[in-house]
Amino acid sequence: EAQWLIRTVENLLSITRIGSDRTELNKQLEPVEEVLAEAVQKARKRLPEIKFSVEVPAELLMVPMDPILIEQVLSNLIENAVIHGKTTTAIHLRAEKTEDNFAAFSVRDNGQGISPALLPHLFDYSIRHASPPTGDGKRNMGLGLSVCSAVVKAHGGRLTAHNHPDGAEFIFCLPMPPADPAISTDLSEEETL
């Protein structure tokens, strides 16, 4: 009960912060492996019955982000997979660099998937309403995915969701800094010496 209340307050504070005109993200270059590991570590404590797996690139992937907010996005997506996936027993998190210079984060579950009728409006809080209480008596405020969308957009990224044969997958992409040709040239010259 206390953890649910804390997460609800965190979501409300984040959406208020992101919605204000003077929002400044605390962006810094962060290794995606550490952000994913932190989110999974916290999720394992709350959801010991779920099997988690993580896949990251072999090379270090540094992404400009507000790590606290991105960890909240990951936590919300994990919790969403468990609550709405209903039959979810495993969640796979993955990060990779895309060809168009984005860092793509994926949260994939083996639950029941997303109703096709909900997919077009999944991130729109004005369309979604609080759901009836779940089996444990808690209400879903409908904030989690709206917060995810707002945080990712504030980072200049995009968030999508789709079903796959064994459940649902949420993918969000954050822009990477442009590669500095001088740095890569210097490194290649040092390697040849």
Where are the regions that the model predicts?
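Conserved catalytic submotifs in the C-terminal HATPase_c
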Residues: 26-29, 51-61
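Short helix-loop "hinge" at the ATP-lid/N-box region of the Bergerat-fold HATPase_c
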Residues: 81-82
